[in-house]
């Protein structure tokens, strides 16, 4: 179906997570010749690599799943309210097998570079060998797929074993009888720490920045709830797409400070009792002003104090200096309770900074700690990391890395000026990581598929954003962020966890509803803001 016959494929997809698998199914269904390259030795994307104990999704299983095939969503039975990594991985394997996707996937094949040819209007993609040509190059490389290893003096000298949560060994790790240290208390660390504490002889947690976390209240999926969901899936999916977060939270349209204190606490209590992200929907201005945010942040701080028995440890676990939610809020199972165990020590690096890793453990400003195993729960080079590691060259020989040296710029998070027929799924400038990722992914994939169909039926070979449209969208993304408290935290949303990375707020805070409306308007106007040839 390709309009350009000078290439071997209509589309090459990079990445076999949720995005890549849905893209492959969708484009193949349109009669396109599509192939997918995946660096791992199985499908799953983020859920292939992140196998650490306790790894699980912070969106409920019935919502963190594909909606494109009703038989699939009816036949699959989730085990828990919040699915663990093995279950999500099994689900994605099932999707690949059920729809016979593997025949068009090359596993253990890392894309190293891609170059656009202006004369033939094709991309040549180099993946661990000879290049293949394609009309469209679609990056489904994920937002959290490149682990970040911190630059800590002496790290390479540690005599024990070191593991990163983002690249966990398939065979697992036995912590029984071991002295273990964990560096990092973001989402990965907060999930890992309670599991390690159950089996380790002793666990030392080296914490630089305390995190806000809410209880998941996870458990087996109630059969009656599952039946109700499956009987009403179309409406549930519709409500998710009609929600700013891509999942229904029961958002309250009141402002926090317009409500008396007692009523506000009652609202927070009700949502705390539901678990998960329900708390963030308590009032519509929680992420808009410091004053409103303080009401929910102080509520969570009080919950931490009430849970952790030792007052000094509790105060060290209290997040300070940034708004709740400005760094991704964590969803945990017994995280704060873990610090009541006798075999767990919290080291507050705000009081005594980490100076170095030693052969035997770690040295801070006032003490030394010995351990046998070191776990790095130090996050990812988010949103742009995977793209930075591929040498992508567009018009005039400009590389994507060079274009983005001052921060990522896109039009709608979908395309980049100067890089024709390069499409991004859940890219910077789209809601992506601020929403239910599967909802955001499905909207992007469907938009991209409709675009390719439009180009084929109208005889166009190439599409890329006009520079003016890209500049306008970047300005809009930045303006929207400035109306919120998000930029007030040194978060991975800002790229602040990567030394030397430009600090700009990368996702789009306007929400899924307004974003999808904008994307649809662009398409309805013949893809306004894009240049088609």
Language-model segments: what does each one mean?
Residues 169, 173-175, 180-183:
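A conserved hydrophobic secondary-structure block that centers on an alpha-helix together
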Residues 193:
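Ligand/cofactor pocket segment of small-molecule handling proteins
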Residues 2-11, 16-21, 25-156, 171-172, ...:
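N-terminal FAD-binding dinucleotide-binding subdomain shared by FAD-dependent oxidases/monooxygenases
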């Amino acid at each position: 179906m390709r309009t350009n016959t000078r290439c071997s494929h209509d589309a090459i997809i990079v990445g076999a997570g949720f995005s890549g698998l849905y893209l492959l199914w969708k484009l193949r269904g349109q009669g396109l010749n599509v192939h997918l390259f995946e660096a791992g030795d199985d499908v799953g994307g983020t859920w292939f690599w992140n196998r650490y104990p306790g790894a699980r999704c912070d969106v409920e299983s019935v919502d963190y799943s594909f909606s494109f095939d009703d038989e699939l969503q009816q036949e699959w039975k989730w085990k828990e309210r919040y699915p663990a990594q093995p279950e999500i991985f099994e689900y994605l394997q099932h999707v690949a097998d059920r729809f016979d996707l593997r025949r068009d996937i090359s596993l253990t094949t890392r894309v190293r570079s891609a170059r656009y040819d202006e004369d033939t209007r094709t991309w040549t993609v180099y993946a661990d060998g000879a290049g293949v040509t394609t009309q469209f190059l679609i990056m489904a490389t994920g937002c959290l797929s490149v682990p970040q290893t911190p630059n800590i003096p002496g790290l390479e000298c540690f005599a024990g074993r070191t593991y990163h949560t983002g690249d966990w060994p398939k065979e697992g790790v036995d912590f029984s009888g071991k002295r273990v240290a964990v560096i990092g208390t973001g989402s990965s660390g907060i999930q890992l720490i309670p599991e390690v504490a159950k089996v380790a002889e002793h666990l030392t947690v080296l914490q630089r920045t305390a995190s806000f976390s809410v209880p998941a209240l996870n458990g087996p999926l109630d059969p009656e709830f599952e039946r109700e969901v499956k009987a009403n899936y179309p409406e549930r999916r519709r409500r998710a797409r009609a929600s700013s977060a891509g999942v229904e939270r029961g958002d309250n349209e009141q402002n926090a400070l317009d409500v008396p204190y007692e009523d506000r606490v009652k609202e927070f209590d009700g949502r705390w009792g539901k678990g998960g992200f329900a708390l963030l929907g308590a009032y519509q201005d929680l992420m808009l002003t410091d004053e409103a945010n303080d009401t929910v942040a102080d509520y969570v701080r009080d919950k931490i104090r009430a849970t952790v028995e030792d007052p000094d440890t509790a105060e060290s676990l209290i997040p300070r200096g940034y708004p709740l939610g400005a760094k991704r809020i964590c969803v945990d199972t017994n995280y704060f309770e873990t610090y009541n165990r006798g075999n767990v020590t919290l080291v507050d690096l705000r009081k005594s900074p980490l100076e170095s890793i030693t052969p035997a453990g770690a040295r801070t400003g006032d003490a030394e700690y010995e351990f046998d195993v070191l776990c790095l729960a130090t996050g990812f080079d988010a949103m742009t990391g995977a793209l930075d590691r591929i040498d992508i060259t567009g018009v005039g020989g400009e590389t994507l890395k060079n274009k983005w040296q001052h921060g990522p710029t896109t039009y709608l998070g979908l395309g980049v000026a100067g890089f024709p027929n390069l499409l991004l799924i859940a890219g910077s400038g789209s809601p992506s990581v601020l929403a239910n990722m599967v909802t955001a992914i499905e909207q992007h994939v469907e938009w991209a598929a409709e675009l390719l169909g439009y180009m084929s039926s109208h005889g166009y070979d190439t599409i890329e954003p006009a520079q003016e449209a890209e500049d306008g969208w970047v300005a809009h993304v930045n303006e929207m962020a400035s109306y919120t408290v998000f930029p007030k935290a040194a978060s991975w949303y800002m790229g602040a966890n990567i030394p030397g990375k430009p600090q700009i707020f990368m996702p789009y805070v306007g929400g899924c509803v307004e974003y999808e409306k904008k994307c649809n308007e662009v398409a309805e106007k013949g893809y306004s803001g894009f240049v088609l040839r």
